[in-house]
Amino acid sequence: MKVRDIIAVIEDFAPLSIQEGWDNSGLCVGSPEAEVSSVLFALDCTESLVDEAIECGADMIITHHPLIFSGLKKISPEDQVGAAVIKAIKNGISIYAAHTNADKVVAGVSGAMAAKLGLVDVQILDEDGEGTGLGVVGNLPQPLAVESVMSLVKDRFSLKVLKSSKPLDGMITRVAMCGGSGGSLIGAARKSGAQLYISGDISYHNFFTPEGFMIMDIGHYESEIEIVNILFSLIRKNFPTFAVRITQNINSNPIYYF
């Protein structure tokens, strides 16, 4: 098995061509012609994840967030990214990221959020191509009061706390969602007819919502973590006898709640 064989499956699911222009999805360390015998999956690539790959014998890492977002001026072991790159190269470990390309397919990050919440009739929220785009919007199976939706969201996403705008009056029937940093899609969520928009990294001023519309911020990590299972299952399904594993340190969230 070669790295390019693994990449082909991922990019059939989420083509690299649909990633956002600022993004750096794809193979950032290694060669597509390198041999691979085992893959380790995680949300974020850190030096400790590379250490785990070495310990478990994985020669490829697949994450959602790219290790390298922009051009590096230097590669140094004193830098977090540089240390991970150096260690990966020394140990023959390839690193691949499926970021906004995995955000922009309906079965990707935001679609996984919708599935967790049980939405039906799900479609792309901000379509920029044939069936691709950021965010999703769908309907609850039945109208729910705000308090019930809050409880459902906290349960399905394993949240101890939930950040929300002022609760609206009336029932919620339609919900828009976007994994990661979704502040830019608030306008699209309102236009979609959703009474509720769920995302992460929402800024302070966006919580001043108009009548009949509300926002819930569940956190960047919490909204995206399911993509790890999606990518893992994708490779396992296509290569059932291949060695794949999800990081044992699954919680790479750098944000702590006290």
Segments predicted by a language model, with ranges:
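Active-site catalytic microenvironments in core metabolic enzymes, especially phosphate/sugar-handling
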Residues: 1-258
